């Protein structure tokens, strides 16, 4: 473990602080707030009225919406069961309305509303006036409300999203024939942005090629210096003014490494793109293992020195070059192959409506297994996920919306797709994480004309080195391949030997594209043998066919490819929903709740044991993991995943052997360690039988399997298994990844319940139902109607999604098995805290808490003291029952003998 991180943890524990007391920071409408009196981002998510149907006249300011449901955004219109594939979700119009009274302090300010994403086509009204009609689901909508607001009285914003199938805008494909799901609603954040009438523009609000907002790029980079170019687009909606543009670049420690001032005169109702440049000496460069981010402060002043606009952006100083057969060069140096996964944004039950912390945790979970590249599938990702990639050192392939569909009949479809290309580059051009621009729809037969325009528009929007577009190398795209910088393929393409290669999707292995049977697609609850097969398939898949060796794209194939192949992304990181198939995609290394399968540990074996000290929340530590449960149905072979040099396996106190985690015949840095034919269920039974009989015994010492991770001849870590015993209790874990939940009315925290034996081993083979309840400053999402609560254990786990309130404080979660009885497993409780939101919340009403289950005390007026005594008595009864059961076990042994 990194000494600095270890010391920090010790200090936090000594001073009684929570390890998770870290409130994550996210960008708002493309910037980070510095002085709210000048430019402010107000959280506009809380208190929207909603109805899941079309309603005539709902745009009117005086429309009666009093019987509508009140929701907080992000909102996906509905909560869905865990399996929501095959068209389960609602498609059609819906309505959102927000009532608010603008603060008098906003008079004279520009007031913008910024929707990060509304699913489908949408219309937006302010006080009954239509201000925007939008076609597209994944790009922000930035609307000026200034001329429509009424101060001192109630205003109403009305939004009508419609996620119905529509061929006229991308993706264009009907959901019932689509390999992902649209879901719906205002599913990303909404911000109210206020600033003066002299301001830096938003790049999507102005139609300027390679302009709008702030544009940063780098040139002449060496370890000694780098040239930084900054374009700032300033609008003046007041009188003509003499202005000063101030730039200040600060490193992570807050040290100012460069500053610059430029004077400019802007006429009334005009704008100017101010071009500035400076040199940074001895720059700290951005890379996956050292993702140094600088803060670029932008301040606009008048000639008297009054601040008219101010904010900051995060930038990472880096250059990339793709040199075909030579591979990827980062900051002028050859960089190893990149390995990662694709990412759809949907989450169990809530669809696309993830709060920022869940997006961040998605990226963090993937980074913690060593991944350093993500392909956006198949649309631009939420800003919070993009922020996370910048911060965690993860490259990203940015993609426009599209999947196996081209509308030949309506020219507007291509026009809108080309607009998506421009908007994508304008939005994400400053991010150090951007590796490739996927400016074509995924797996689609597009015309050559489109290829020409899409690549041309990308170059116009990013006219500097480091811009790389990508398309498939398949033969039916051969006419278009020459226009792109990079090709998607398994390895070097014969017809384009000088082009760099990236593998966009690897691992999936279906029999046909109707049935979708595959060794790669494994629901976690199917158990250990299918999970082991999935992991080993992702490591290597080959077979003999007609006397020839066949190989499928795998980890082995990727690492064994030529240097032309500089990176690859697994299909897919998480299980996700689909429109055209009744089954979800089950090929993730984590399930839809982001809980790991065995293949998760295959990837984690590639995580280094040191060298990631600069990556937040990621500890490069030795680990070893036994992918075996020692059940009566477990396989004979024992597979162990590790990032150590060697693994020593001990069973029942006897050493089985020591094996290396490297293989001279494999190009993969770490291979699965397989101990062949070492587990026999009868041995496990006999060992477990002989050692049992003590009250409160956690496990039978003689029945333990232990793997020890060895580095440089020393044991540095270990992992033990034993046959899971009688299910005794539930155990809860707050899966917050060290990111403290925010009390913003939107944040969601995952709490996992495990059914365990006395020693804490998870009883994977169990089908109990678990009921969750929540007290304090949180609310349980879902209930009986959407199969969320109570919830059946899947592979020994049940998951609660807890939404925070708008008040910071304590949240208490309780889990109990649905059935009652003296021998029922004990309940579990856990508490966590939320912290205040980063931004001001603006709302006039809150959703009502939905409580489907209210525990009834034995006595209606039962006091807290009586309740405590009743619980203690119940625990004593259980302990007595434990003694009785042990005696019964001894009697049965005697009788059988």
Predicted segment positions?
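Short glycine/proline/serine/threonine-rich loop/turn segments at secondary-structure transition edges
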Residues: 106-109, 149-154, 240, 280-293, ...
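Beta-strand-rich structural segments
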Residues: 230-233, 299-300, 638-642, 747-764, ...
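Substrate-binding clefts and catalytic carboxylate motifs of secreted carbohydrate-active enzymes
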Residues: 39-59, 78, 118, 178-185, ...
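Extended acidic/polar, glycine-enriched regions
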Residues: 150-154, 231-323, 832
């Amino acid at each position: 473990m990194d000494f600095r991180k270890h010391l920090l943890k010790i200090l936090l524990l000594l001073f009684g602080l929570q390890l998770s007391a870290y409130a994550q920071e996210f960008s708002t409408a493309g910037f980070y707030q510095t002085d709210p009196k000048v430019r402010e981002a107000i959280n506009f998510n809380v208190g929207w009225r909603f109805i899941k149907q079309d309603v005539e006249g709902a745009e009117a300011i005086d429309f009666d919406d009093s019987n509508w449901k009140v929701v907080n955004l992000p909102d996906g219109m509905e909560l869905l069961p865990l399996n929501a594939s095959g068209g389960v979700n609602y498609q059609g119009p819906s309505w959102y309305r927000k009532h608010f009274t603008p603060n008098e302090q906003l008079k004279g300010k520009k007031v913008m509303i910024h929707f990060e994403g509304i699913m489908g086509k949408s219309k937006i009204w302010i006080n009954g006036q239509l201000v925007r009609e939008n076609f597209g689901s994944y790009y922000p909508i930035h609307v000026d409300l200034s001329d429509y607001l009424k101060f001192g009285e109630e205003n109403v914003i009305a939004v009508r999203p419609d996620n119905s199938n529509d061929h006229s805008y991308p993706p264009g494909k009907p959901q019932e024939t689509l390999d992902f799901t649209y879901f719906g609603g205002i599913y990303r954040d909404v911000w109210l942005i206020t600033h003066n009438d002299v301001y830096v523009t938003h790049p999507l609000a102005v139609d300027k090629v390679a302009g709008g907002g702030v544009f940063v790029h780098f040139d002449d980079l060496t370890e000694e210096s780098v040239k930084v170019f900054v374009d700032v687009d300033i609008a003046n909606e007041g009188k003509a003014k003499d202005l000063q543009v101030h730039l200040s670049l600060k490193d992570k420690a807050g040290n100012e490494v460069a500053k610059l001032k430029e004077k400019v005169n802007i006429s009334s109702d005009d704008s100017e793109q101010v071009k500035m440049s400076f040199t940074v000496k001895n720059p700290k460069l951005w890379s996956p293992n050292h993702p140094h981010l600088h803060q670029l402060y932008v301040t606009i002043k008048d000639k008297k020195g009054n601040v008219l606009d101010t904010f900051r952006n995060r930038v990472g100083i880096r250059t990339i070059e793709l040199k075909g057969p030579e591979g990827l060069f980062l900051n002028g140096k050859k960089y190893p192959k990149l390995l990662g996964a694709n990412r759809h944004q949907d989450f169990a039950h809530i669809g696309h409506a993830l709060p920022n912390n869940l997006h961040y945790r998605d990226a963090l979970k993937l980074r913690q297994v060593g991944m350093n590249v993500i392909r956006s599938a198949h649309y631009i990702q939420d800003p919070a996920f993009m922020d996370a990639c910048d911060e965690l050192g993860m490259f990203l392939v940015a993609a426009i919306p599209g999947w196996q569909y081209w509308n030949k009949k309506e020219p507007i479809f291509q026009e809108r797709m080309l607009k998506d290309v421009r908007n994508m580059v304008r939005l994400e051009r400053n991010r150090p994480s951007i590796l490739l621009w996927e400016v074509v729809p995924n797996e689609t037969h597009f015309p050559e004309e489109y290829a020409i325009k899409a690549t041309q528009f990308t170059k116009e929007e990013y006219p500097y080195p480091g811009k790389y577009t990508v398309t498939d190398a398949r033969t039916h795209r051969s006419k278009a391949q020459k226009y792109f910088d990079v090709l998607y393929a398994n390895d070097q393409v014969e017809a384009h030997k000088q082009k760099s290669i990236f593998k966009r999707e690897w691992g999936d292995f279906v029999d046909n594209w109707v049935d979708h049977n595959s060794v790669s697609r494994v629901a976690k609850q199917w158990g250990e043998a299918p999970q082991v097969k999935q992991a080993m398939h992702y490591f290597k898949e080959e077979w003999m066919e007609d006397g020839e060796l066949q190989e499928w794209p795998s980890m082995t194939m990727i690492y064994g490819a030529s240097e032309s192949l500089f990176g690859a992304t697994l299909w897919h990181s998480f299980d996700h929903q689909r429109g055209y198939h009744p089954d979800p995609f089950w090929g993730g290394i984590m399930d839809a709740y982001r809980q790991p399968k065995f293949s998760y540990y295959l990837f984690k074996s590639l995580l280094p044991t040191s060298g990631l000290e600069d990556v937040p929340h990621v500890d490069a530590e030795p680990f070893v993991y036994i992918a075996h449960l020692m059940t009566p149905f477990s396989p004979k072979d024992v597979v162990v995943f590790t990032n150590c040099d060697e693994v020593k396996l001990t069973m029942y106190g006897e050493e089985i052997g020591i094996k290396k985690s490297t293989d001279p015949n494999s190009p993969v840095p770490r291979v699965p360690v397989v101990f062949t034919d070492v587990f026999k269920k009868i041995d496990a039974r006999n060992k477990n039988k002989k050692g049992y009989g003590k009250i409160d015994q956690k496990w039978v010492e003689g029945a333990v399997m232990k793997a020890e991770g060895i580095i440089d001849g020393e044991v540095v870590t270990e992992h033990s298994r034993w046959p899971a015993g009688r299910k005794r209790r539930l155990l809860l874990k707050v899966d917050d990844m060290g990111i403290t939940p925010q009390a913003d009315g939107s944040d969601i925290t995952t709490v996992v319940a495990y059914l365990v034996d006395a020693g804490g081993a998870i009883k994977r083979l169990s089908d109990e139902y678990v009921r969750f309840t929540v007290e304090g400053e949180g609310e349980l999402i879902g209930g009986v109607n959407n199969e969320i609560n109570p919830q059946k254990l899947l592979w020994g786990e049940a998951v609660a999604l807890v939404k925070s309130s708008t008040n910071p404080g304590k949240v208490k979660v309780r889990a109990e098995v649905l059935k009652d009885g003296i021998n029922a497993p004990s309940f579990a409780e856990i508490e966590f805290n939320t912290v205040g939101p980063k931004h001001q919340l603006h709302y006039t009403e809150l959703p009502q808490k939905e409580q489907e289950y209210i525990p009834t005390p034995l006595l209606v007026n039962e006091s807290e003291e009586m309740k405590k005594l009743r619980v203690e008595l119940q625990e004593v009864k259980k302990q007595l029952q434990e003694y009785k059961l042990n005696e019964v076990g001894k009697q049965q042994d005697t009788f059988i003998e």
